[in-house]
């Protein structure tokens, strides 16, 4: 059997490595391919439901709920004022976001005139803290459902991970102490709301634009990374 030269072996290994990298690379898809129902139904008005909270932070729902409406409006949709609709739901005895999931979406069309309903789930709203480092993670699942058919028109995940560590404060024990103090201070002052907005923005990059956006019905070929919750 002939020996394989080092050069030939290198080429083979590079080819195999290339296939592995390509296979592991995030999949890019288009809005039109992934969310065809958005272009068929073309919803104009969206009703935001109170978020479901699966994180360990009890106050996550209250903070996160303030971050959704503005970004959706910038995407070209008419969005019902969240605080008003949330109060109406409370007056109807619906205090818990989990209860909303059991209501047929057609009811929201009947009562509010909404074309679609946005359900959000807070998956992570967490601080991971160690002496010299800490990480802030905000992760949101979002799903838009039709009030005509109850079908899912769009769903996606937005996640933001922020390093709050103190960085390099010099060498030795003094440097370690300084880094620990900086990390503790930055962790204590961490504000989730801006990062929740970032998570929303990352999710909405895959949402087709609404009627009041200049690119309405022209973004079918726009690509994004597939992070749709399975």
Language model region names:
Residues 48, 72, 120, 142, ...:
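Buried hydrophobic packing residues in well-ordered domains
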Residues 2, 32-35, 103-106:
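A generic local structural motif
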Residues 97-153, 163-171, 175, 218-230:
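Surface-exposed short loop/turn segments
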Residues 1-25:
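Sec-dependent bacterial lipoprotein signal peptides
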Residues 43, 55-119, 151, 155, ...:
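N-terminal segment of the mature soluble domain
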